[in-house]
């Protein structure tokens, strides 16, 4: 069985790890980095992922996607999506099913389809390291992701050619990474996870009993639309406002200028974690009739902190709720772990430290801990990691809509998963022949205040007065936190059941079509690589042949020279095209035409060697010295 890899699919950066022996190892990508920017660019000719996509973002802002995780599993009309529509340089559109999609080069794409490009790069990184195909993965998601966001993440995995063996919550993965080597007894750990686009807090009990380590999530809370991107946006707004005050020009309608501003704001924010002042300097940011305009703004750490103070404060309320849900006080928490790049900000660290009244752990890498935890969980699933039990929870309550538009909960939030629950309901009207089961997720009493996960009908109920039929509704949450619902008429035994997907979401057919599309592109990529190799070999052959013609000089007969030059011309023409077979054929023909050159070079080398060697040695030459001569000639060519 192949390795199961662990992937942290992040808003800003992604990371892949694998169990190497008994330790989880973070893998370096093709660029030599341990994390990969979660940026995807469509150039019209190819798809770029990671650092190559980031490098060209300024010149291709409308077709370069970042923070796509903020859209995954969301509806276009959601408030969070509408906020992003106004500030993103790329186009966010409403799909036919109501989902939030994106558009590049007039092609509409679902967020799982775009995210799959990042997962494919993670998959390739692991395959390059392991030297074998990878088909299975554990992928992390924010703990506060709802059912449709989790399902969309699994869809992204399928499109990338991965069977997602488990969806695991990011704070839980970080706790696994932190606690796997620590064998002490009962320990309450708070994992504060502030990433690029999401925020989670999980209270986790790590216990060691009879050699088995148990990681039990006691409570989780968070905000799936709060993260480093929001911090960046505050600084971007400030810089744009300052420029408008000074120059009287609005940069917000210029995607190119806004992309440059975004890069500069992110860089300034990072710098201000280690220095108290920085300067944002963007020459030629725009121009008007009077000439080019430059943006030069000094930003202090204090200014940045004042811009984002309310965002930091917003993270503290979920901490209070999570502690209350776990029935714990601040003093019960033994360790505080910070995860996510945004936790490097001194203001964030100070506020969290003050809230818990203790020093924060410094031995956890905020960028890599989640991927390491995912790899550990992959090891648990494959049987490579023994004596570890992970007990996660569902982050939000689940229930159905009942009479009066009320949400009746069947499974409360922070219930350990996998879990099952059932409840018996009845009809609201006399002789009602069918009931609609409307499945909801959230904490509000009024059904409209919660997330609709989907609905289905149970038909064929025998006529009876209202309140008489007995309809059992059963909820079953699997280890990925994904919900399966069934409804059964107890009298007739008629049943209806579904695996809940979002009321929109991608259908199986759409996912399969995207998988086929991804596979087709993989074939295209492989063919393109073969074509480039053939071109490089042909170019190399032409270059070497020209050099040998020059060296041969008058020794090469005019007839042979003409034949070789004709063959070279054919290669140069073939290289301009895209026919790999034609390039290889013309290269082979050039090799055959150049045989006279090889003879001349060999004779010349033998003559030179004969002059250098003593006469007796020259007479005693052995037949296999031809091989030495050829090697000698190659070295000589290199030196020239």
UniProtKB/Swiss-Prot annotation:
Instruction: Cite the Gene3D superfamilies for this sequence.
Output: 1.20.1270.10, 3.30.420.40, Actin, Chain A, domain 4 (3.90.640.10), Substrate Binding Domain Of DNAk, Chain A, domain 1 (2.60.34.10)
The similarity comment for this entry is: Belongs to the heat shock protein 70 family.
Q: Give the Acidic residues compositional bias ranges.
A: 626-640
Encoding gene per record:
dnaK
* Keyword match Transmembrane helix: no
Q: Where is the composition biased (Low complexity)?
A: 601-621
Q: Which NCBIfam families match?
A: PRK00290.1, prok_dnaK
Q: Which InterPro entries match?
A: ATPase_NBD, Chaperone_DnaK, Heat_shock_70_CS, HSP70_C_sf, HSP70_peptide-bd_sf, Hsp_70_fam
Stored Pfam families: HSP70 (PF00012)
Name one molecular function that GO assigns to this entry: unfolded protein binding
Job description of the protein: Acts as a chaperone.
- What turns on expression? By stress conditions e.g. heat shock.
Q: Which UniProt keywords apply?
A: ATP-binding, Chaperone, Nucleotide-binding, Phosphoprotein, Stress response
Per its record, how is this protein called by name? Chaperone protein DnaK
**According to the UniProt record, where is the region Disordered?**
601-640
- Positions of post-translational Phosphothreonine modification: 198
- Signal peptide positions are none
Source taxon at top rank: Bacteria
